[in-house]
C-alpha cells in the first residue's frame, strides 16, 4: 500500500528538486583542468602538478553531484515525472553536444584525408607514417566494445523484467569489457610508430581515439555507480533513470567507436 502510494505521489507534475550548485562547480573544475592540461602540454612550468589536482577536484565535485541526485531520487522521492523529464532532456542535450564535438574531429580528419596537401606528401597517411593495421588490435577492441553493448542491453532488459541477478551479471561483464578495452587502447598507443606530434594525421588520430577513450572511462564510471545502486537495491523495474542514462551514454560510445574504426582505422590505413 505504501509502495503504491509512493508511485502515485511521484506521478504529480510538480518539480521538487532544489537548485543545485554542482553544475556550476563542475564547469569551473573542468575549465581549470582543461586550462592546466593545455598549458602543461605547451611546456609551462608548474602545471604538471596542477593537472592531477584538477583531476581529483573534478572527481570530488562529480561525486558530490552524484550523491545529491541519488539522495533526491532514492531517499527523498523528489524525482517526479517533471523532474525525470528534465533529467532525460538534459542527458539528451548533453549527448547531442558530444555528437557535434566528435563531428568537429571527423571534419578535421576528412578535411586533410580527402585532399592531402603537398606538405603531407600528397598522400594519406602522410609520407613516412605507417598507420595501425585495422585487422589486429583495433578489430579486437571493436569486438570487445560491441560485446559490451550487448551485455549492457541484456542487463537493462533483465532489470525491466525483474531479473535482478541478470542485471547485476550483465553490468559486471560490461564493466570488465570496458576495462579490457581501455587497457588494449593503452597498449596500442605504446606500440604505435607515430605520436600526436607527427603531422595532422597523428593529431587527429590521437585526439579522436583519446577523446573517445576518455568517454569510455566516464561511461565506465557511470556504469560502476549503476552497479553499486543495483547491489544496494536502489533501482526497480520502473524507476532506474540514472542507470538508463548511463546505458544510453554507453551506446553512444559504441556508435562513435564504429565511426572511428571505419574512418580512421580502416579507411585511413
Curated annotation (Swiss-Prot):
Keywords attached to this entry: Membrane, Mitochondrion, Mitochondrion inner membrane, Translocase, Transmembrane, Transmembrane helix
Membrane topology summary: Multi-pass membrane protein
Entry EC no(s): 7.1.1.9
Localization per record: Mitochondrion inner membrane
Pfam family, one: COX3
Residue ranges of the TM segments: 24-44, 46-66, 90-110, 138-160, 167-187, 207-227, 247-267
Primary residence: mitochondrion
GO MF annotation list: cytochrome-c oxidase activity
Catalytic activity reported: 4 Fe(II)-[cytochrome c] + O2 + 8 H(+)(in) = 4 Fe(III)-[cytochrome c] + 2 H2O + 4 H(+)(out)
An annotated GO BP: mitochondrial electron transport, cytochrome c to oxygen
Any one cellular-component term (Gene Ontology): mitochondrial inner membrane
Subunit structure: Component of the cytochrome c oxidase (complex IV, CIV), a multisubunit enzyme composed of a catalytic core of 3 subunits and several supernumerary subunits. The complex exists as a monomer or a dimer and forms supercomplexes (SCs) in the inner mitochondrial membrane with ubiquinol-cytochrome c oxidoreductase (cytochrome b-c1 complex, complex III, CIII).
Biological function: Component of the cytochrome c oxidase, the last enzyme in the mitochondrial electron transport chain which drives oxidative phosphorylation. The respiratory chain contains 3 multisubunit complexes succinate dehydrogenase (complex II, CII), ubiquinol-cytochrome c oxidoreductase (cytochrome b-c1 complex, complex III, CIII) and cytochrome c oxidase (complex IV, CIV), that cooperate to transfer electrons derived from NADH and succinate to molecular oxygen, creating an electrochemical gradient over the inner membrane that drives transmembrane transport and the ATP synthase.
Family that this chain belongs to: Belongs to the cytochrome c oxidase subunit 3 family.
Designated name of the protein: Cytochrome c oxidase subunit 3
Organism from which the protein derives: Emericella nidulans (Aspergillus nidulans)
Gene expressing this chain: cox3
Amino acid at each position: 500500500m505504501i509502495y503504491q502510494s509512493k508511485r502515485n505521489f511521484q506521478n504529480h507534475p510538480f518539480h521538487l528538486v532544489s537548485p543545485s550548485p554542482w553544475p556550476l562547480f563542475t564547469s569551473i573544475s573542468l575549465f581549470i583542468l582543461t586550462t592546466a592540461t593545455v598549458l602543461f602540454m605547451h611546456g609551462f612550468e608548474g602545471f604538471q602538478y596542477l593537472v592531477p589536482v584538477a583531476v581529483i577536484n573534478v572527481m570530488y565535485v562529480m561525486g558530490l553531484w552524484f550523491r545529491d541526485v541519488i539522495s533526491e531520487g532514492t531517499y527523498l522521492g523528489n524525482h517526479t515525472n517533471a523532474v525525470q523529464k528534465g533529467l532525460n532532456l538534459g542527458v539528451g542535450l548533453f549527448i547531442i553536444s558530444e555528437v557535434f564535438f566528435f563531428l568537429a574531429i571527423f571534419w578535421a580528419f576528412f578535411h586533410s584525408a580527402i585532399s592531402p596537401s603537398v606538405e603531407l606528401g600528397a598522400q594519406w597517411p602522410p609520407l613516412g607514417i605507417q598507420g595501425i593495421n585495422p585487422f589486429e588490435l583495433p578489430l579486437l577492441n571493436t569486438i570487445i566494445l560491441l560485446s559490451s553493448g550487448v551485455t549492457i542491453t541484456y542487463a537493462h532488459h533483465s532489470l525491466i523484467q525483474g531479473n535482478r541477478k541478470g542485471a547485476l551479471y550483465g553490468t559486471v561483464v560490461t564493466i570488465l569489457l570496458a576495462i579490457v578495452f581501455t587497457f588494449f587502447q593503452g597498449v596500442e598507443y605504446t606500440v604505435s610508430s607515430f605520436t600526436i606530434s607527427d603531422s595532422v594525421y597523428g593529431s587527429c588520430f590521437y585526439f579522436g581515439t583519446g577523446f573517445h577513450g576518455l568517454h569510455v572511462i566516464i561511461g565506465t564510471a557511470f556504469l560502476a555507480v549503476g552497479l553499486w545502486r543495483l547491489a544496494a537495491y536502489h533501482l526497480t523495474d520502473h524507476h532506474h533513470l540514472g542507470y538508463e542514462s548511463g546505458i544510453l551514454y554507453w551506446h553512444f560510445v559504441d556508435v562513435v567507436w564504429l565511426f572511428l574504426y571505419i574512418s580512421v582505422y580502416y579507411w585511413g590505413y
